[in-house]
A protein has these predicted regions:
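Structured-RNA-binding interfaces characteristic of tRNA pseudouridine synthases
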Residues: 1-188
Length: 188
């Protein structure tokens, strides 16, 4: 049986999503917790890997297991085996054809920047920081040029496994609320 689940995590203490030999990763924590509940080794596939220190509010992953557990048992069992910085938000059985990475229609990202002269002491790991005044209105206007299909080859890593770098940006916006500048982008 294949299951999909939504995971929220604070990436501050992790080397990123992907399993590493000598560093803690979100993937290794989730696989360990799921394996404890399933009573067998479990491997998870995610919709998109995150880098060191990056957080996720609803990372979708899938895994396969023949263990008979209710959704509630999967949820409670996993969350009791995860560190406080990682939580399963929901879980459901899905069709065998579901793939967290390749079935996804889009991904949304949010970048938050504290824009003030003094570096923040609280919540610093959840924000970028820029001491120079950002013009969020002009940033928003300029960002609209990214709407639609574009080739983002220049932003790919050397080992990128995607077949192409053409992405369709369906939404992008920049807004300010006090000292916080938020950039949101949704693309395929």
């Amino acid at each position: 049986m294949r299951y999909a689940l939504g995971i929220e995590y604070d990436g501050s203490g992790f080397c990123g999503w992907q399993r590493q030999n000598h560093s803690p990763s979100v993937q290794s924590c989730v696989e360990k917790a799921l394996s404890n509940v399933a009573d067998h080794a479990v491997t998870v596939i995610c919709a998109g890997r995150t880098d060191t220190g990056v957080h996720a509010y609803c990372q979708v992953v899938h895994f396969d297991s023949n263990s008979q557990r209710s959704d509630r048992q999967w949820m409670l069992g996993n969350n009791s085996n995860l560190p406080d910085t990682v939580r399963v938000l929901w879980i459901k059985q899905v069709d065998e054809s579901f793939h967290a990475r390749f079935t996804a229609h889009s991904r949304s990202y949010q970048y938050r920047i504290i824009n003030r002269w003094v570096r923040p002491a609280i919540g610093f790991s959840h924000y970028g920081w820029c001491r120079h005044e950002l013009d969020s209105d002009n940033m928003h206007k300029a960002s609209q040029a990214l709407l639609g299909k574009h080739d983002f080859s220049a932003f790919r890593s050397a080992g990128c496994s995607s077949q192409h770098a053409i992405r369709d940006v369906s939404a992008i916006g920049v807004a300010r609320s006090g000292d916080i500048v938020t950039i949101e982008i949704t693309a395929n």
